[in-house]
Amino acid sequence: MELVVQSRETDKKSVIKKIRQQGGIPAVLYSGGKSLANIVVDARVFSKFLSTLESGALASTVFTLSYEGREIKALVKDIQYHVTTYDVIHLDFEELVDGRDVRLNIPIRYINTVDCVGVKLGGSLRQVIRCIRVVCKPKDIVPFLELDVQSLGLSQTLKLSDICIPEGIRPVTSLKEVAVTVARR
């Protein structure tokens, strides 16, 4: 996803409020844990993209930020929502540097849920874990990991170790954890 961002100068409440009134989202770009720049993202463009995004996939979505003539690859590290309207009011981006490890949550996509044997026998599919914490290089980031639940019967479970994890991605979460189960109703 490509975003055109503008620079902003101050952290004063009045300026940030004005940015939001003009249809912008105040954001901070970090690199190596340190603040690199205060920026503004177009709220309409970001919200439209967010509405098309699969649930949980924002954490593993790589953005290309066009900032002052440069193309910067970044991940959303934090997002803040308005309490009542649920509008995005602030973003934190982390710059991706080639060769430097990045920690992120990659969502798990459960496939063949309709064809699951246990569900056909009257069971209920319960997703225990929705994402897995990993460490990898920016070039190895994938949007999601898949886990096939078609052969899962009643009262059976699949663990994180059953997920085919691509080379270059090292899980931080214990692979002994239960990812999904089919429970009797």
From Swiss-Prot:
Part of the 50S ribosomal subunit; part of the 5S rRNA/L5/L18/L25 subcomplex. Contacts the 5S rRNA. Binds to the 5S rRNA independently of L5 and L18. Belongs to the bacterial ribosomal protein bL25 family. CTC subfamily. One of its GO terms (biological process) is translation. The keyword Membrane does not apply. PANTHER family: RIBOSOMAL PROTEIN L25/GLN-TRNA SYNTHETASE, ANTI-CODON-BINDING DOMAIN-CONTAINING PROTEIN (PTHR33284), RIBOSOMAL PROTEIN L25_GLN-TRNA SYNTHETASE, ANTI-CODON-BINDING DOMAIN-CONTAINING PROTEIN (PTHR33284:SF1). GO terms for cellular component: cytosolic large ribosomal subunit. This is one of the proteins that binds to the 5S RNA in the ribosome where it forms part of the central protuberance. The gene is rplY. It comes from Chlamydia trachomatis serovar A (strain ATCC VR-571B / DSM 19440 / HAR-13). The keyword Coiled coil does not apply. Transmembrane segments: none annotated. Keywords: Ribonucleoprotein, Ribosomal protein, RNA-binding, rRNA-binding. InterPro entries: Rbsml_bL25/Gln-tRNA_synth_N, Ribosomal_bL25/Gln-tRNA_synth, Ribosomal_bL25_b-dom, Ribosomal_bL25_C, Ribosomal_bL25_long, Ribosomal_L25_dom, Ribosomal_uL5_bac-type. GO terms for molecular function: 5S rRNA binding; structural constituent of ribosome. This is Large ribosomal subunit protein bL25. It comes from the Bacteria.
